[in-house]
Amino acid sequence: MNFVNKQFIKDYFRGKRVAVFGSAPNCLDNNDAHIDGFDLIVRVNNYKIKGVGFDNIAYDYTSKVGNRTDVHYSFYGSSILKSAKDLWRDGVKLCMCKCPNEFLFEHEVQWDPKNVGSDFRPLYRRRQDFWFCDTYIPTKEDFMVYFDSLRGHMPTTGYSCILDLVQCEPKELYITGFDGFKCGKHNVDEMWRDKKERYDPIGHIPEAEMHYIKALQYYYDFIKLDRSLSE
């Protein structure tokens, strides 16, 4: 296991055909032949390919989403249930972290009395024995670029992932499975619970993120959006 820097990440993706998967239900509007043809497949947080769901019902989405995962991108909080064994089994060779291993700023809200929402160091203390492959952790300065692009709101993991990949200048970046939680679900079929965000002055603003993501296709000719994002 090695911790790698931003230049390593840029070299890793540059010139490659890359597919990045969010976990909105529309990620299933794909087929495995198309997805498996990409050089690198990036999946976010609690992605689903094949297994047993939270309701103890087995699922198999391989015919829709492919069966390979080359890169896992996550904020790696306690809600991320993927184990190192899960990721290794799926073929992950690079982990990319959304958050810096640093304290950002004071952030006191009712549901977050310990201010953990803007101090990411506890995430990494809990994960100190987790890392098993090349791992990228952004600097505070890089993270704040995305925070500032949303006028002082916390970026979602998907938004940060897409912007990180855009900076790497791949040959193609196919973006699928992102809907800004419009359908009310994530992890393909689980309800999105965002009650705390309504009371958080720096909480997510997915509508603004979706507007930005859709606009990327007009600035970068290597961006390819899925059917839902293109509408």
Language model features with spans:
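Metal-ion/cofactor- or nucleotide/acyl-coenzyme-handling active-site neighborhoods
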Residues: 1-231
